[in-house]
UniProtKB/Swiss-Prot annotation:
One of its GO terms (cellular component) is cytoplasm. Its main location: cytoplasm. Coiled coil: none annotated. It is an enzyme of class 3 (hydrolase). Its EC number is 3.6.1.31. This is Phosphoribosyl-ATP pyrophosphatase. Pfam families: PRA-PH. The lineage of its organism: Bacteria, Bacillati, Bacillota, Bacilli, Bacillales. One of its GO terms (biological process) is L-histidine biosynthetic process. Belongs to the PRA-PH family. The gene is hisE.
Amino acid sequence: MKNAFTLLFETIKERKRNPLSESYTNYLFSKGEDKILKKIGEECTEVIIASKNNDNEELVKEMVDVMYHCFVLLAEKNISLEDIMEEVTERNGKLSRVGDRREIDTL
């Protein structure tokens, strides 16, 4: 049985291959990468607001929106979930130290 993430990603890829005129996913693909990236930015802002408001129910919903739009971006760039899982697996269990990260100089 496939998990919800796999099913969602497969649906997104299917919309890319076989567009439906009333599909929001198809709308995003038709507008291109800039629109997809704009939506990811908007949804990330909504995640921040929900978190700052301590609204966990809204936070879950907004996180799903971020993930959906990131999946659309992955499909747009022809990156598979397997590619993402391989990277997660590669990183899993590795020590990461604060000193290993570059400092953020400006925001």
